[in-house]
From Swiss-Prot:
Disulfide-bond pairs as recorded: C114-C355
Name of protein: Dual-specificity RNA methyltransferase RlmN
Cofactor(s) needed for function: [4Fe-4S] cluster
EC assignment: 2.1.1.192
Catalysed reaction, written as an equation: adenosine(2503) in 23S rRNA + 2 reduced [2Fe-2S]-[ferredoxin] + 2 S-adenosyl-L-methionine = 2-methyladenosine(2503) in 23S rRNA + 5'-deoxyadenosine + L-methionine + 2 oxidized [2Fe-2S]-[ferredoxin] + S-adenosyl-L-homocysteine; adenosine(37) in tRNA + 2 reduced [2Fe-2S]-[ferredoxin] + 2 S-adenosyl-L-methionine = 2-methyladenosine(37) in tRNA + 5'-deoxyadenosine + L-methionine + 2 oxidized [2Fe-2S]-[ferredoxin] + S-adenosyl-L-homocysteine
Taxonomy of the source species: Bacteria, Pseudomonadati, Pseudomonadota, Gammaproteobacteria, Enterobacterales
EC class: transferase
Length: 373
């Protein structure tokens, strides 16, 4: 079917943020345009943060008029901004009538954007604020890449943040926001391809990290789709504890998750094959030195580093953060096993932007059965 007839029939414009370079090539080919048009459009979108065809000076007037009829460049809208005392920024972005949250973390020579992949999350981890919100749906490509685009656009417009003209102001992107990325793997990987593309944001693979609670089939799929650093949200040294705090462990237990991580490490080159293990420290739950010994033994033979994460308070969740003494004792044990381990610095806790605190606003919750994951 002719592209413009299709759009006329369904009365819906094509959002160009949903398309990677290959898809844009097909799109412009169907319009009878040369392949270089896709490159021009991508430069305007991702290098100049332009969402108005009228300002694209090297696009012909006739093509501009045609694009205005059938296409749009539409990213999520920021409806609220919160600034932490440590410089972290949290943006609430509107998706339909719901909200997702995206976090910008500036450091000395590094800036990290924490991106969401779903509206809510279906996994129900008992210590996580996102899980308490329930789950509505996966984000599409434009809603994922749109978070990056909107953040970069806003930062470049902010004269208080020193950025060279039109330079991409983000050095690292982590898929650690709302949702489980591997349950939305097709859209997430498509968005990552745009981030990596020279006509997109031109970020290096080693500066993107995807975090998963351990969706084993997703880990296997990911390594065949794209080679990027992987983080495993483990949070327990054994199945007894993990079953209690992470229900997904009843579907994919620790052994199966770590075996998938081991294979990912062997079959990928990003981050030199090293996996990041994330471990939130919950007082009197998983923070004993015996747990540290168990964890170290579980990780034997897997090239990895461990991020120990102080638990951040979340309303209506009855956990507490480990004491500094217990955290340091836990760290000391892991270092004795020669495992690279750090205690992650808390950022953005005063605006509920720290690890596990993102909630957004989820309506029309959907219950997913674990056998469908």
């Amino acid at each position: 079917m002719d592209l413009e007839k299709y759009i006329f029939m369904y009365a819906k414009k094509v959002n160009l943020l949903n398309m990677n370079k290959e898809e844009l090539l097909i799109f412009f080919d169907k319009l009878g345009e040369k392949p270089f048009r896709s490159h021009q459009i991508m430069r305007w979108i991702y290098h100049y943060y332009c969402d108005d065809f009228n300002y694209m000076t090297n696009i012909s007037k006739s093509l501009k008029e045609r694009l205005k009829q059938i296409a749009e460049i539409r990213a999520p809208i920021i409806i609220k901004e919160q600034l932490s005392s440590d410089g972290t920024i949290k943006w609430a972005m509107k998706i339909d009538e719901q909200q997702i949250e995206t976090v910008y973390i500036p450091e000395n020579k590094r800036t990290t954007l924490c991106v969401s992949s779903q509206i809510g999350c279906p996994l129900g981890c008992s210590f996580c604020g996102t899980a308490q919100q329930g789950f509505n749906r996966n984000l599409n490509v434009s809603e994922i890449i749109g978070q990056v685009w909107r953040a970069a656009q806003l930062i470049n417009l902010n004269k208080k943040i020193k950025i060279k003209n039109n330079r991409f102001p983000i050095t690292n992107i982590v898929f650690m926001g709302m949702g489980e990325p591997l349950l939305n793997i097709v859209n997430v990987v498509s968005a990552i391809r745009i981030i990596l593309d020279d006509f997109g944001f031109k970020l290096s693979k080693r500066h993107i990290t995807l975090s998963t609670a351990g969706i084993v089939p997703g880990i296997e799929k990911l390594k065949n789709m794209i080679d990027i650093p992987l983080a495993i949200s483990l949070h327990a040294p054994n199945d007894i504890i993990r079953n209690k705090i992470m229900p997904i462990n009843k579907k994919y237990n620790i052994n199966s998750v770590l075996e998938a991580a081991r294979r990912y490490s062997m079959d990928t080159k990003s981050n030199h094959g090293r996996i990041t293990i994330e471990y939130v420290l919950l007082k009197n739950i998983n923070d004993d030195v015996l747990h540290a010994h168990q964890l170290a033994k579980q990780l034997q033979g897997i090239p990895c580093k461990i991020n120990l994460i102080p638990w951040n308070p979340i309303p209506n969740i009855r956990y507490a953060c480990s004491s500094q003494i217990r955290m340091r004792a836990f760290l000391k044990v892991l270092l004795k096993y020669n495992i690279v381990t750090i205690i992650r610095k808390i950022r953005g806790a005063d605006i509920n932007a720290a690890c596990g605190q993102l909630t957004g606003e989820v309506i029309n919750r959907i219950n997913l059965q674990y056998n469908s994951l």
